[in-house]
Regions:
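Short N-terminal "domain-start" leader segments
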Residues: 1-47
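Short, flexible coil/linker elements and helix-boundary hinge sites characteristic
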Residues: 22, 50-51, 91
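Residues in flexible loops and secondary-structure boundaries
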Residues: 37, 68-69, 87
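Intrinsically disordered, low-complexity, charged/polar segments
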Residues: 44-81
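Charged, solvent-exposed faces of alpha-helical coiled-coils
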Residues: 78-81, 85-88, 92
Length: 94
């Protein structure tokens, strides 16, 4: 989404992640978040390499690449958790 401030256009991005449904998506800031003064003001104050964890499903940033790194971190964490759980099941003594 493009935020207009004093003639400046800035793209903001959102990272959506849902562990239960194994879903991770990066997209331009959605209209509902863009129209929130609180959200757009908060994001506009972030440094170029910062992220803002809005809740347990959304993280925002000015830089798409920063969100790509965050998405990879989340995926790796989920994989480690799944592997740990799988190993626990494999090691059940019967």
């Amino acid at each position: 989404s493009v935020i207009k401030r004093k003639g400046v256009h800035k793209m903001f991005y959102q990272l959506f992640y849902d562990k239960e449904n194994a879903e991770i998506k990066i997209a331009p800031l959605s209209k509902s978040f863009k129209n929130s003064t609180f959200t757009s003001d908060k994001i506009s104050k972030l440094a170029e390499d910062e992220v803002w964890n809005y809740n347990s499903f959304y993280t925002f940033a000015k830089n798409r690449n920063v969100l790509k790194l965050k998405a990879h971190e989340i995926k790796e964490k989920w994989l480690a958790e799944a592997e740990s759980r799988l190993n626990a099941v494999k090691n059940i003594k019967i």
